Amino acid sequence: MKKILSALLLIFAMLLSACGGVKYELKDGLMYDADGKEATGTFEFKTGKYKVKGNFVNGLPDGLFEEYYEDGSIMAKETFVNGEMTSKELFYKNGNLLGNFTENDDIKLYYDDGSLILSYDAEKEESTYYHENGNPLMIGNSYETTLYNENNEVISKLRDDDLTDIGATLKKLDDGTFELVKGNEVIAKIDANDEIINYLYSTGEPLLKVNESTGETEFFFKNGNTFMKGKEGGSILNYRDGKPLYEIDGDSETIYNEEGDKIVGGFDLVTDIKKLD
């Protein structure tokens, strides 16, 4: 009887081992073992539907963490030092860089072909958005914002929230609307009520629509799709086909790849924790 009981206990122990044995919990960014102690080692787990692998030291993330798309390609690489994230890189499924975030809060976002979408210099507190051809579209900081057409020509400049002289002339048309002309080029059209201004590409397509009465702004690609649009409490930046890329909603930020997959990052909705060593 004792031999049978011992054999059953051995089988039960083997089953426990096969089922994972020690259970771990990731809570508030810290990894704990079954006894509630801060764990050390390399772990693999899921955040939503994506797999993550990385190292913890005394419960804190430390070193390189990699997050994977469902097909196994790299989605994100995050580097931690003693629990603090020092850098983050995001990737398209083909391996090209989507975004780069540094410890000092510098940001760069890229199209799939490697061209820049936007960059943020934290030291200067300056944001730069780019045309599809790589020229700057808008450069803005705490005191000045400059708008450019695709040929790198200034078509609007604000300094301390006031429009500055860029050498353009306002021309009133027979229908009561206005055109803003710089040289021989129409750079903007304004409605008769002086409420809506449409800045233009050099070839005449809408570039930026500003509604003075509502405060709404909307930037456009040359193909007519929305590039960027402000909304209450935030803004949304799109790919060339109009699908969302980067969305800000209050204090929340979301980044999507070109297929619409949400780039998760961080340690939210963690399941299936496994210790690898």
Model-identified regions with their sequence ranges:
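Glycine/tyrosine- and acidic-biased, solvent-exposed loop/turn segments at the edges of beta-strands
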Residues: S17-D277
